[in-house]
Structure formats: C-alpha cells, structure tokens
Amino acid sequence: MSAETVPQKPVLLTGASGALGRILTRALGEAGWTLRLTDRVAFPDPLPEGARFHLADLEDGPAILRLAEGCGTILHFGGISVEHPFETVIGPNIRGLYHAYEAARREGARMVFASSNHTIGFHERSEVLHDDCALKPDGYYGLSKAYGELMGGLYRDKHGVESAFLRIGSCFPEPTDARMLATWLSYADLTRLVMRATLAPSLGPDGTVVIWGASNNSRMTWWGRDGRDTIGWAPQDSADAYAQALEGKTSGNPVVERYQGGGFTGLDYSRRDDSGR
C-alpha cells in the first residue's frame, strides 16, 4: 500500500466506541491503516488487523499523552456528542480536548477534529455561510466545538499544530427529516473526508481548514466556501433520493425551522421576542 492511501505513522482515534468511531475503525482498518483506538468504554466490535484498543478517559492527560506516542495524526471524535448541561460537557469536551491538543503538540501530529454544524447553529437558514463566518453556537455542545476550533487556532499560531475542523452535519445511515435533506453526511462521505484530511500533504498556508460536513445534497444552500479543495475531498453521496419521503417532515416549531442548528436551537429556548438574530 502506498503513502497516498495509508499514513506512514499510526493514527490515534479517540471516541472509537461511539457510533462514528466504530464506522471509521472498520473503514480505516479495511484500508490498511494502523490504528490506536481509545474510549472510556470497551470497543464493542472485533478489532481490524493493525488496530489496538486502549481503555482511557479523555480527562486523564497522562494517558492520552502515552497513547499518542509515535502517532502522526489524531482523529479527535471523543467527548459528549449531543446537548447536555454545561457541567457535563466541560470535562470531556474542554479538558479532554486540551489533552488531545497537548498530545498533538508534543508529537508534532496533525489534528482532525470532529467539529459540528452546531458551532454555527444560530445562523438563519436564509444565510449562506463560508468557512470564515462568525461562530454562533446553539447550545453548550456547540459551544464546546467552537472552543475546540479556537483552541486549534491557538495551537497552530503558537506551536505549529495543523488542524482540520470537520463541521459535521447529520451523520447517520440515512436522513430522517426534511432538515437532513440539506445536512446529511453519509458514512462513506465521512470516511473519505477523514481520509483526505489525514493524507493531504498540506492543510494550506494557514495550516488550518474548515470543511462543511455534508454530502452532495441539492437542498444544502446554507453552506458555501470551505477548504475541501485544499485537501482534495468531494462528497459522492446525496440525500436527494429521500426527498419525496421526507420533504414535508418538519418539526412544526418556528425556532427550530428558522435556524441552521435545527432541534438544538429549541432546547431550553426562552427568548420572548420573535425578531430573530
């Protein structure tokens, strides 16, 4: 296998036991990657050849440093993956992220960070956002992902750590509502995105790229310019085939339907005016 398809150094994948971690483990393992997997819960599937799993908590800094030894890339998919109270999010998503970046700094590794569309969730759907848009998180989860992108910028400016920020839309086996006709990211497109973010020779002159993580969906009119050409990624799948079944499947909540973040924007929403942002 060539260096164009397989990284020369091992790759550390955090959050390996989660839904997306399991998908990536299988796909990258089948591609011949040497994987070092970690999560705070046991890995539930058979390990692919070349993969080793280590039970560890992201809040255990020394453990994360040990796991990253010799790795050329860290795929940071660990942490809380949905909205939770701030005190629940802060440990794995803030402190754990810091430990991952410290490991990347020490190893000179590239960071591929599973960011989220919820970093910009309070932009309205009528807006077209580019990769340099203002961050408008729609909850504590999105706030933690926005913080992660800011931390990546700090570690690039101060330590030269490269980062690819993948603003993942809705990554599920298939779309399940009208919003996902725009935001859906297939598992195969996610895998190709992670591969290109890892294998690209450069992340551009700034050393950081933001990628909108959606498949080739004709209804995705909200997300514009990003760094996909820099890494050589083009989504191949599309939610369009599901349009007839899902087009009218909306929440009925005007807040949820106005903003790009969808259901997360409506959680604990208490604004009394209806003027938007």
Question: What are the roles of these predicted feature ranges?
Answer:
Residues 99-138:
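Conserved Rossmann-fold NAD(P)-dependent oxidoreductase catalytic core, especially the SDR/UDP-sugar
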Residues 32-44:
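Conserved glycine-rich Rossmann-like NAD(P)H-binding loop of the short-chain dehydrogenase/reductase
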Residues 59, 88-99, 135, 143-146, ...:
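Glycine-rich NAD(P)-binding loop of the Rossmann-fold in SDR/ketoreductase-type enzymes
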Residues 11-31:
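N-terminal Rossmann NAD(P)H-binding glycine-rich loop of SDR-like oxidoreductase domains
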Residues 44, 209-210, 216-238, 248-275:
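Conserved C-terminal active-site "lid" loop/helix of NAD(P)H-dependent oxidoreductases
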Residues 91, 124-163:
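Catalytic helix-loop patch of NAD(P)-dependent Rossmann-fold dehydrogenases
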Residues 44, 52-92:
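NAD(P)H-binding glycine-rich loop region in Rossmannoid oxidoreductase-like domains
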Residues 168-174, 184-207, 216:
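Alpha-helical substrate-binding/gating segment
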